[in-house]
Amino acid sequence: MPSKSSVSGNSVEERIRSELGLSKEVTLIRRNAPAAVLYQDALKEKKTVISSAGALIAYSGEKTGRSPKDKRIVEEETSRDNVWWGPVNKPCSERTWAINRERAADYLRTRETLYVVDAFAGWDPKYRIKVRVVCARAYHALFMTNMLIRPTEEELANFGEPDFTVWNAGQFPANARTQDMTSKTTIEINFKAMEMVILGTEYAGEMKKGIFTVMFYLMPVHHNVLTLHSSCNQGIKNGDVTLFFGLSGTGKTTLSADPHRLLIGDDEHCWSDEGVFNIEGGCYAKCINLSREKEPEIFDAIRFGSVLENVIYDSESHEVDYDDSSITENTRCAYPIDFIPSAKIPCLAPAHPKNIILLTCDASGVLPPVSKLTPEQVMYHFISGYTSKMAGTEQGVTEPEPTFSSCFGQPFLSLHPMRYATMLAEKMHEHSANAWLINTGWTGSSYVSGGKRCALKYTRAILDAIHDGSLAKAEFESLPIFNLQVPKAVEGVPSELLNPARNWSEGEAKYQSAVSKLAGLFVENFKTYQDKATSDVLAAGPQL
């Protein structure tokens, strides 16, 4: 591997040619090509078309979602002692890495056109990293142009050598018989080489989430900056910052879109000593069942320059049918964040979060619509990352299933969850942040037994009470077993909804049974982390 020296923007092509052994006569290299040029090239692929709204419709082939079982971290001396090894971060040897990197290079050498995207991850100039993506599909180049932070002309001219490089040869399979491999797909990250190789999957989200994994490593280890899988907004009037954590279907995107607040970002953030900044320059929004009525900002962001992934459209009008999931439930759109009118540009806040919101969609109906958390409870529930996986979100899921994802982003974590949880608790204590657990799921009973989903208007009323400071001053009562502090009243929310013990349609005995069942799942899940948890954190969980 050549050493990383300063290289001017004009010699990027020479560097890529040298690294891959490319012939000038054979391969055209497009660097930071504009959207119109990428559209032109993408449309040469058979299925790719332009939607009636002007977005590029592209298809990722066999893989329409991430392949977490095929993610590998190279086991090497610089990162070995920090990485959280296990099912999330499976190791591969440096030899396997070398084989797969060369396999990717072999494939890229055969392409008539390669695309290079040089851009940034992280809006704070103090912490941002320079990222280079090398790929063979124009759709992938446009996707990463949208998702990374686009450099100015001057920044591009002075870009120099990247801090991290993605080699995307996803159209070409890995050799499943190579050591440490289990399939024809591999997504490998090498923290020593600061590179990533993709083989055997054309799903564009692997690039985005690979860089997220890198930031989950670099920021805490090298800068003592906390990386978070969250959305973030800031009050227009008071400048107060709120972080929203939540798994798919909990309302993270919907609730962070607020007419009284500016959007800093919808998915990936860092919390430093200076404040909060977005990692990305774009949004990767779910499109299933999308409508202008439900999500007007997302709907209107789907226009020229955006990438629609794996959607079904009318062959004559090219109008997209957002309700059609025949290819996948995981239809997506990638667009620059400045396509959202309420976005704050640059996407950072020189202020510390005043409120931390942990969102859950509890289909058991046991958890209250809102409860106030102690710092120890924040650590416990942050590490647990509980929600209910709803029917239809994954193949074979016909009824809601309880699921846990540590730090609300387990597939992307590089370090042990306790490291992130400890940093979060320390920052909350230092900056006197309030923390809340909000259940956007069922009340009155479980989903199966006829409970009702908590109305969005009530959840928004709860958020309004959090943001105006009135909820922090409310009178609270304790909910047994989970020991959650539940407000007795919230303006705009029926009081009978606030305490599920009083609201349970099947009576108190059935409620206690449901509570004990859910608490048991929490306790069982937390056994994975209890060896690194303090007694205070363990005591903050449900007590059976």
Curated annotation (Swiss-Prot):
It comes from Candida glabrata (strain ATCC 2001 / BCRC 20586 / JCM 3761 / NBRC 0622 / NRRL Y-65 / CBS 138). GO terms for cellular component: cell surface; cytosol. PROSITE patterns: PEPCK_ATP. Disulfide bonds: none annotated. PANTHER family: PHOSPHOENOLPYRUVATE CARBOXYKINASE (ATP), PHOSPHOENOLPYRUVATE CARBOXYKINASE ATP. One of its GO terms (biological process) is carbon utilization. GO terms for molecular function: ATP binding; phosphoenolpyruvate carboxykinase (ATP) activity. This is Phosphoenolpyruvate carboxykinase (ATP). Its EC number is 4.1.1.49. It is an enzyme of class 4 (lyase). It catalyses: oxaloacetate + ATP = phosphoenolpyruvate + ADP + CO2. InterPro entries: PEP_carboxykinase_ATP, PEP_carboxykinase_C, PEP_carboxykinase_N, PEPCK_ATP_CS. Belongs to the phosphoenolpyruvate carboxykinase (ATP) family. Keywords: ATP-binding, Decarboxylase, Gluconeogenesis, Lyase, Nucleotide-binding. Pathway: Carbohydrate biosynthesis; gluconeogenesis. ATP binds at residues 246-253.
